[in-house]
Structure formats: C-alpha cells, structure tokens
A protein has these predicted regions:
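Zinc-dependent deaminase catalytic domain
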Residues: 1-119
Length: 119
C-alpha cells in the first residue's frame, strides 16, 4: 500500500504531490489523488469556495461515498502521503477543511512527515 501511494504521488502534475488511501484492516477501499476537478465538498470543506482542485483526501472520500456509501467510511483509516519530486516524504498533514471531512465521516488518519509516517 505504501509503495502504491508513492507511485500515485509521482503521477501527480501538481507542485504538491499528494495521494490518499482509505482502508479497513488489510482491505484497500479506494485511492485518491489531488487533481484539477471540483466537487461540492470542495466548497463545503475547503477554505476557498472557488477552488478548481480536489485534495487527495476528498477525492478518496467521494469515491467511497459513490461506490459503497457513508457507512463504509466510519471506523476506516485514511492514509495521506506527499512526496517531493525526488521521491522523499514530505509533510502531508490534512488541511483544516480535509480534517473536518475526515472527522465528519468518522475516519482515523495517518499521514507522512519529512521523517516518514505518523499516526
């Protein structure tokens, strides 16, 4: 799962390369990446209601909502990864808006720092 997150970060065309995975136990539910795509949750949870991008966390949450529903999210874990252009870990603590969404849907969160993973 960790290598897959790094691979998905590397595919990003953004300066900040983020990917997220939502999982329960050893079962991966969905991956998300930051992208040029909007969703109503961008304005609801984001700082900028006119944003034209979707954070990796919200991308993953929306995918689960569309495929399996909100009940699937409660108690699952979201892991958020950011890598630099040369593949090193970077700080990927969810922003204030994404953190509100994570809490609203009852997810546990893990993310990368420059030193690696934290919980």
């Amino acid at each position: 799962m960790e290598l897959e997150l790094q691979r998905r970060c590397a595919e990003s065309t953004f300066r900040s390369r983020h990917a997220a995975v939502i999982y329960r136990g050893k079962r991966v539910l969905v991956y998300g990446v930051n992208r040029n795509k909007t969703h109503p949750y961008c304005s609801y949870y984001g700082k900028n209601p006119e944003a034209i991008y979707l954070h990796a966390e919200l991308d993953a949450i929306v995918k689960v909502l569309n495929s399996e529903g909100a009940k699937t999210l409660k108690g699952a874990t979201i892991a958020v990864c950011r890598t630099t252009r040369d593949g090193r870990y970077a700080d990927s603590r969810p922003c204030e808006g994404c953190q509100r969404a994570i809490e609203a849907f009852g997810l546990k969160v893990e993310y990368t720092t420059k030193e690696g993973w934290t919980e």
